[in-house]
Amino acid sequence: MEDLLHSIEQKVKPLIGLGKVADYIPALANVDPNQFGIAIYSNNGELYHAGQAYTDFSIQSISKVFSLTLAIKHYGEDMWKRVGREPSGNPFNSLVQLEYEAGVPRNPFINAGALVISDMNQSRFASPHYAMREFIRRLADNPHLNSDQIVANSEYEFRARNASMAYLMKAFGNFENDVEDVLHSYFDNCAMRMNCVDLAKSFSFLANKGYSQLSGEQILSARETTQVNGLLATSGLYDEAGNFAYRVGLPGKSGVGGGIIAIVPNRFSVCVWSPELNKSGNSLAGMAALEALSESIGWSVFG
């Protein structure tokens, strides 16, 4: 497997230089684009990696999967009264659909949906970001994980669009807490710094019927795990979810920091990272690497 990952690394390296790092978050604009890492963590506890798999990066929207998992653990089916389960087809930070649909976001992985989930967690925990950080540390088996406050502060400074979504949802009665407090927690979560190995380990529970062998916890039930993977397959890659399903055929979630996680149910979790993004905000080399991996191993949730 490690030989395969090294060959994939060499295959996608020519793509580096053809994308663009996220520049709408100033603290992310300075990331060296000439980087690539990939890691796999199997249900047997085996770790394989290649490239810069131990280089930390900002997980950004990948954090939405952690937030959703916490909300499911504490709210169960009741949470779906406030957020939908349908693909959006619009950019991840769109306001148009949100107003048209009376302040109920299409799914938990667009920004509006993630803000509602953060609002729920704000109601549940006295210190939401602390609860999230400790949860992620357990899943990754890494007690040293933290947020990058420079990135979090940068995102908060340029919060206008996210704040607009939150206030719009509040106007429709779908936001309970102080908007600025929720935004701080939301950006702190997005600014968590992790690497490919951390993330592959963290999401191993989604490949293992909800059980994390690293923390020894049943994180979600087997049924809830299937449901989360279904949402990842339909809505995990912004408005490129269909293309990802076509090319890769696995549940996945991306972030504008250049990371993408993907799940091979009952087998392993994988994280790939390369900072340059395509026009949809997904890692250019990362998408190609996961497509090459899927082709090589012949595993897809679609048969």
From Swiss-Prot:
Its EC number is 3.5.1.2. GO terms for biological process: glutamate biosynthetic process; glutamine catabolic process. InterPro entries: Beta-lactam/transpept-like, Glutaminase. Substrate binds at S61, N111, E155, N162, Y186, Y238, V256. GO terms for molecular function: glutaminase activity. It catalyses: L-glutamine + H2O = L-glutamate + NH4(+). The keyword Hydrolase applies. It is an enzyme of class 3 (hydrolase). Transmembrane segments: none annotated. Keywords: Hydrolase. NCBIfam families: Gln_ase, PRK00971.1-1, PRK00971.1-2. Belongs to the glutaminase family. Homotetramer. PANTHER family: GLUTAMINASE. HAMAP family: Glutaminase. This is Glutaminase. It comes from Marinomonas sp. (strain MWYL1).
